[in-house]
A protein has these predicted regions:
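Left-handed beta-helix
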Residues: 139, 146-317
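Hydrophobic packing residues within well-ordered alpha-helices of enzyme cores
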Residues: 23-27, 144, 192
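Active-site glycine-centered loops adjacent to acidic/histidine catalytic or metal-binding residues
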Residues: 70, 97, 185
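Conserved beta-strand segments of alpha/beta enzyme cores
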Residues: 36-38, 113, 170-172
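Conserved core of the sugar-phosphate nucleotidyltransferase
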Residues: 73-148
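Conserved N-terminal catalytic core of the sugar/cofactor nucleotidyltransferase
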Residues: 1-68, 72-79, 86, 298, ...
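Structural beta-sheet core signal
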Residues: 13-14, 66, 91-94, 173
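Short internal beta-strands
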Residues: 13-17, 94-95, 269, 287
Length: 317
């Protein structure tokens, strides 16, 4: 959402399915970003092109961006949107050079235009992967109606884009500058966290007692408390978080209202209102959801690694 807002977009439709309660709770009505949010319900996963199709009334003839929510871009999409609007093609797709194109949908180019899209090619003719950010004019709705479901019974956006190409319409590439992360896997989320933390400027608005050590680039939000602890940056400690008798960082994001007590954690993300206490072994390379409780009892290993959902509780013995 922040990437869309930074590009000047103020009217956002969010296509939701069976996880819509969590998304509605996190996004709300958009007032936190001074935007308008409309929720568009998709009864079951039928593909990205289907999601575009059911959004036609919301789009109402305007050019529009399709942004897959698990993508993170270093420089946002401002220049991508500007380029489209200056000379609108039928579609414009965001691409990134990758070292393993056989793992992605890949675009082939000629004379500055996209000529073919190939999903996970065995012998790639290009190293340009589809990032998962697209911009379209109204012609795409005709293409969505012309395509058939894929082998997984979904309407694929790549098929709709290929139909635009086959009908002689212009599909323009836009190459990502800076890093791009698809955060669909734990290691990608943690790498994105590391990259973002490196961009922060030092800021300490919370309380750090005289018995604590702060090293490196740290952000400590208002009303956070650090007592008898070591925090090594890059790291962020959210509002009202409490770090007591603990070692946090580097490359660690502690969100609002989290309590870390008598524990060590590094290269990890801990979401809101979670508690980690009395762990004799370091937590590393972990993503811990909201309102999670992790308590120590007994352990013989040298490190823990977790990927825990919201409202989880782990008792280690």
């Amino acid at each position: 959402i922040e990437a869309l807002v930074s590009a000047g977009i103020r009217d956002i439709g969010v296509v939701v399915g069976d996880t819509q309660a969590e998304i509605r709770s996190a996004v709300g009505d958009g007032s936190a970003w001074n935007i308008k949010v409309t929720y568009i319900e998709q009864d079951e996963p039928r593909g990205l092109a289907h999601a575009v199709s059911i959004s036609q009334d919301f789009i109402n003839g305007s050019p529009f961006v399709v942004y897959l929510g698990d993508n993170l871009l270093n420089h946002g999409i401002g220049t991508f949107v500007e380029e489209f609007l200056q000379n609108p093609p039928a579609a414009q797709i965001l691409l990134s050079h990758v070292t393993n194109p056989e793992m992605f949908g890949v675009a082939e180019l000629s004379d500055g235009k996209v000529t073919r899209l190939v999903e996970k090619p065995k012998t790639p003719m290009s190293d340009l992967a589809l990032v998962g950010v697209y911009m379209f004019g109204p012609e795409v709705f005709t293409s969505v109606k012309r395509i058939s479901p894929s082998s997984r019974n979904e309407l694929e956006i790549t098929d709709a884009i290929q139909d635009l190409i086959d009908r002689g319409l212009i599909v323009r590439p836009h190459i990502v500058k800076g890093w791009w992360k698809d955060t669909g896997k734990l290691e990608d989320i943690l790498e994105a966290n590391r990259l973002i933390l490196k961009t922060f400027e030092q800021r300490i608005d919370g309380h750090v007692d005289a018995n604590s050590l702060i090293e490196g680039k740290i952000v400590i939000d208002a009303d956070a408390i650090i007592e008898r602890s070591v925090v090594r940056g890059p790291a962020i400690i959210g509002a009202r978080a409490k770090i007591i008798d603990s070692h946090v960082g580097p490359y660690t994001s502690i969100m609002n209202d989290v309590v870390i007590k008598n524990s060590e954690i590094e290269n990890s993300i801990v979401l809101e209102q979670s508690l980690i206490s009395d762990l004799a072994t370091r937590v590393t390379d972990s993503l811990i959801g909201k309102n999670v409780r992790i308590h120590y009892r007994k352990s013989t290993s040298q490190a823990y690694s977790f990927m825990l959902g919201d409202n989880s509780e782990v008792n280690i013995s």
